[in-house]
């Protein structure tokens, strides 16, 4: 799989779609600082936001429908910092234009939307990565690989509770309409599932139930025979917030380490995209995996609401 630039020696030209907090705090800094990448431009729905972010990182701003096409023309790949159901059709558009894609999780909040992305990527033969933080942060990526190799796991527990909507929270991410509508299941659920599935195997049976506020509880049966429980939410009191992932099995217990922030992890995702472009070997956390995550989350949401 060759990049649109025609050579793997040249920097990979990656354009950024989106100008919100995630783009400002994580993606744009990571792309601009990456030695193997040229940040080829920033597109935003608001011209002033696109101009500000592009100026901060020494690149060009794009806006409007024609700006999307112009950014695709100037890029080998595009990264997305947009709500999932805005991201999905634009990812299809980028793939059909022959551009590699680096998506945020979840790929979409409907199965049809996620399937359209995976199908477009397959038909175009482009590289794809879905940015699930723990799969690309160096510390947790190495830990996941180690636990997969150890095997013999009996059960697991994952708890990802944020305080985004807790009283007194001042997080700018709380202003995201899609997060408020879909809650922790959709925002942090992909992170937990992206750790459990490679270690324990695919989910063969899923049970979901609602908890307080936006919290969702899952019980999963995996193809290895192991089971896992998951608690997800964005409304925990600040003193109760935190992330814990633990496996228990034949060799004892293993708990996930901490990691050095989202920007470092995103650089790892950029590296993974570049490697897939270079080798043509799909990454395990690609558009197909993103589609499967959406299928599981839709099933869980349906059960929890019922």
Where are the language model's segments positioned?
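C-terminal helix-rich "cap/oligomerization" subdomain common to oxidoreductases
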Residues: 1-11, 66-69, 77-79, 223, ...
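N-terminal Rossmann-like dinucleotide-binding module
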Residues: 1-58
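Contiguous beta-strand/loop segments that form the cofactor/metal-binding neighborhood of enzyme cores
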Residues: 190-257, 271-279
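Beta-loop-alpha module in the N-terminal Rossmann-like domain of NAD(P)-dependent dehydrogenases
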Residues: 57-118
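Predominantly a Rossmann-like dinucleotide-binding segment in NAD(P)-dependent oxidoreductases
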Residues: 127, 134-206
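Active-site loop of classical SDR/Rossmann-like NAD(P)-dependent oxidoreductases
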Residues: 22, 45, 238-241, 260-271, ...
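Short active-site oxyanion
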Residues: 38-41, 76-78, 128, 183
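A short helix->loop->beta-strand "cap" motif at the edges of active sites that frequently abuts
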Residues: 59, 97-99, 124-127, 225-226
